[in-house]
Amino acid sequence: MKAIIHLTLLALLSVNTATNQGNSADAVTTTETATSGPTVAAADTTETNFPETASTTANTPSFPTATSPAPPIISTHSSSTIPTPAPPIISTHSSSTIPIPTAADSESTTNVNSLATSDIITASSPNDGLITMVPSETQSNNEMSPTTEDNQSSGPPTGTALLETSTLNSTGPSNPCQDDPCADNSLCVKLHNTSFCLCLEGYYYNSSTCKKGKVFPGKISVTVSETFDPEEKHSMAYQDLHSEITSLFKDVFGTSVYGQTVILTVSTSLSPRSEMRADDKFVNVTIVTILAETTSDNEKTVTEKINKAIRSSSSNFLNYDLTLRCDYYGCNQTADDCLNGLACDCKSDLQRPNPQSPFCVASSLKCPDACNAQHKQCLIKKSGGAPECACVPGYQEDANGNCQKCAFGYSGLDCKDKFQLILTIVGTIAGIVILSMIIALIVTARSNNKTKHIEEENLIDEDFQNLKLRSTGFTNLGAEGSVFPKVRITASRDSQMQNPYSRHSSMPRPDY
């Protein structure tokens, strides 16, 4: 046992000597040397918690080691030794040497619960500026435990660390245009997960270059699913539509002639085919096809080739309609079909915004300069018409050209709004009707009250007369309220009531 302790002390002395030599140098240079035999791991009186496996051996491949020699060190921790293929790492912060085990090769017989793999962490120390390669242990449960130079078995390394793994996730960018893949001052247009390069008008992108070509505008009808949204230009469905149209034109004209197809607008419409399914619809796609400048195709041949390809295939395309190139640029028809958009003459109602633009657009709306009088402003009275100087709403121009306020009941532009007048008339009539109804209600109520008072007076009078008759002493009052009592007399039997109508002599006879 004493012999082992003496050997350990000798090893520590040699380590201190190597450490002093390393501190005098400015940098540590590493070279690759082949290690043929295993090195016995050892530790000083400060124990380091490293995984150990008793009575295990492993074949060790060669690893890069430091230039300073490292003698074998006998472990005093236990009776078993741990063979390690890696050379010991000499620390510049303490007097102990920490052997770090690494992974064994395919012939290793080490237990599966022991060390599995080993990655290399490059750590830089802020104190001495030295860089050391420290192997970090990887347990079987995929937990990383990097080793530092301060005799610690876990925790993050000091300084800047770079971890190198064998598997790298090389996923592409989420935005295809973020790396600016388009050259020659072209624009990168993003779709869903792909993109294409767009050049100036009349040019197409080919081999990282914008080349001049012939422009053939038109419209093509394509069958799409019911859920297709033409506004979602970054959707997968829109990307498929762009790819389908591009493939059609590339197959029709060939790669030597075909340049590029640009989608301008996409509009939805009802399907003209009755045999289509209910969940299908078609869209009208306004496109511009650019062919090589040396092509012999014209507008007629281009239309014929495309429609022929549509009829002969069972694709989702319905038909292709040509748009004249001169109409596309807004120019008058020329003999060369407006091949040079900059040289064509604009139509009468259009103008070129600048000499470098091939398109003729509608003239800008400009108000007359003299429209600065009182109660006047620049207005567009007709849809699509030119602006003109007119009176503001509520005023009307007189014979002298001055703006006068509208008459009562009129308002709006040029005093054509009669709403106020109509409202006044209707309100007046409604007021009269309501007032008449109120008066009639009052009269009716007073009439009912007057009739009720007359009946009460008649009842009072009858009661008064009955009381007056009772005071005379007559017991046989007259019938039906008569003040004269009836007297019964006996009439003679011989005398008969004479009917006045029976005396014909005294009565004139009727003449009928």
UniProtKB/Swiss-Prot annotation:
The keyword Ligase does not apply. One of its GO terms (molecular function) is protein homodimerization activity. Residues 22-38, 135-176, 493-505 have a biased composition (Polar residues). Residues 443-512 are cytoplasmic. Pfam families: SEA. It comes from the Eukaryota. Residues 1-18 form the signal peptide. Keywords: Cell membrane, Disulfide bond, EGF-like domain, Glycoprotein, Membrane, Repeat, Secreted, Signal, Transmembrane, Transmembrane helix. It is a single-pass type I membrane protein. Homodimer of beta subunits. This is Mucin-13. It comes from Homo sapiens (Human). The lineage of its organism: Eukaryota, Metazoa, Chordata, Craniata, Vertebrata.
